[in-house]
Amino acid sequence: MTNYYRIMLGKKSAHFPECSAGGYIGSGFGDIVRDVSGELTEDFRSFSQRFMPEMQTLHPGKSKIALGLWCGFAWTICKNIRVGDLVLCPDGSGNYQVGEVTGPYFYVAGGNLPHRRPVRWLDRTGKRLPRRESSFGNLHP
């Protein structure tokens, strides 16, 4: 079964052009600048327990809720999204772009959004709808 995920590629999807050109989605993951391949757990709770202390050290002024959300997004990008799932991402021009995840997590040292998944961006856009009316039925080729 294909799952759909709405993602942001940086604040206001500022990194979308780079991600689109490079064929990937990614997460900055709170300044954790190392490959976490060997630390990806099957469940979010274990992942969060592993990384929350490190996140609190890196960002002592952030709330546990904010750090938990950060961990949740990183885990979703790095582990939870499956090959074949679709991602919907704002492109900065008022539309959503659609991509299909094509491979596993990889890390790019020194890159923007270094925690990445390969994506094949599809030739589809979706108009932004008010939240209460949102659906995936408005995608068109």
Go through the PLM ranges and name each one.
Residues M1-F73:
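Compositionally biased, charged N-terminal/linker segments
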Residues V119-P141:
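Glycine- and charge-enriched low-complexity intrinsically disordered segments
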Residues G94-Y107:
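Short beta-strand-centered aromatic/proline hotspots
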Residues Y105-R120:
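Short, solvent-exposed secondary-structure boundary/capping segments
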Residues N80-R82:
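Short, well-ordered loop/turn sites that connect or cap secondary structure elements
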